[in-house]
Swiss-Prot record:
GO BP, sorted A to Z: double-strand break repair via homologous recombination; protein stabilization
Organism ancestry: Eukaryota, Metazoa, Chordata, Craniata, Vertebrata
Chain intervals with Polar residues compositional bias: 269-278
Function: ATPase which is preferentially stimulated by single-stranded DNA and is involved in homologous recombination repair (HRR). Has a DNA-binding activity which is independent of its ATPase activity.
Compartment(s): Nucleus
Region of interest: Disordered: 237-278
Domain of life: Eukaryota
GO molecular function, one term: single-stranded DNA binding
GO CC annotation terms, alphabetical: nucleus
Subunit structure: Interacts with ZSWIM7; they form a functional complex involved in homologous recombination repair and stabilize each other. Interacts with RAD51, RAD51B, RAD51C, RAD51D and XRCC3; involved in homologous recombination repair.
Keywords: DNA damage, DNA recombination, DNA repair, DNA-binding, Nucleus
The name this protein goes by in its record: ATPase SWSAP1
Length: 278
């Protein structure tokens, strides 16, 4: 998953030499509430679905109310058909889903995504339960990788809401980092004033890996723009910042969302009526 997310943030660039078929290390996607974690997970799912290596398993507590992104890839039905959603409503249902993964007749996924880890851990906040769930997630991804064989490996990303990057503000973060060597932090980006939602995404693939950063902007119409984040950008005039960012931006279209004929029609309708995260 780390590689699928990196390619999303790198505007869909191809994998670097020697990385073809590599899923990358297990990754934690961290950010405050409403920091667009679901949107980035969905973008990574569509990216992986287009690689031709297998389906994508997207696990979340409740059905999405609508497509998190309005993008050209989100309107490609063949990509959407390769993303399979599962909605375990409790931590026990989640554990059962993972434990029975070897019995599932569905195609083996090349990417496993879990959204809203904090909601499941809230039911049993013990460190033992967090460690057990993390280990089971890794075991499930390893099992999928074994089944894929020569076709590649199964990536894993887990989204966890936390208020700050400080470990003291996330009780299980030090423990979870032992299982997930890669992390991507989503933080408010002060350089994005005037945008509907602007975040700074910081990606580290491991302790010895350099940190790579981007500015991610979401507009009301569903358009997402990604530009390299540069500390010196704060020293530029607004005109120069706009010019510099525009030359490297990824713009994902903001046309209307798919209509009733979309493969996700029905899947995206929540029976609970609860609001989904974006």
């Amino acid at each position: 998953m780390a590689e699928a997310l990196r390619r999303v943030l790198n505007a869909g660039c191809a994998a670097r030499p020697g990385e073809d078929g590599a899923a990358g290390p297990p990754l934690l996607l961290l950010g405050a509430p409403r920091s667009a974690q679901t949107s980035l997970l969905f973008a990574a799912a569509l990216e992986a679905a287009g690689e031709g290596r297998g389906s994508v398993l997207f696990v979340t507590r409740r059905p999405l109310q609508s497509l998190p992104l309005s993008t050209p890839t989100a309107r490609e039905h063949w990509r959407l058909q390769k993303v399979r959603f599962q909605y375990p409503s409790s931590i026990q249902e989640l554990l059962q889903l993972l434990a029975s993964a070897h019995e599932a007749p569905a195609p083996t996924p090349s990417l496993l995504l879990l959204d809203g880890l904090e909601e499941y851990l809230a039911e049993d906040p013990s460190a033992q339960e967090a460690a057990y769930l993390a280990a089971l997630l890794l075991d499930t991804a390893a099992f999928f990788s074994h089944r894929l064989g020569a076709n590649g490996s199964c990536g894993l990303v887990v989204a966890l809401e936390t208020q700050k990057e400080a470990e003291a503000d996330a009780p299980h973060l030090p423990l979870l980092k032992r299982y997930f060597p890669a992390q991507c932090w989503l933080q408010p980006d002060a350089l994005g004033l005037g945008q509907h939602c602007c975040l700074r995404a910081s990606l580290e693939l491991g302790k010895l890996s350099p940190r790579t950063e981007w500015s991610v902007s979401f507009l009301p119409c569903g358009e997402m723009k990604v530009t390299p984040w540069l500390a010196q950008a704060s020293k530029l005039s607004p005109e120069k910042k706009d010019s510099s960012a525009g030359s490297q931006s990824l713009t994902l279209g903001c046309d209307n969302l798919p209509g009733p004929g979309s493969p996700l029609d029905g899947i995206l309708t929540s029976e609970t009526g609860a609001d989904s995260k974006t």
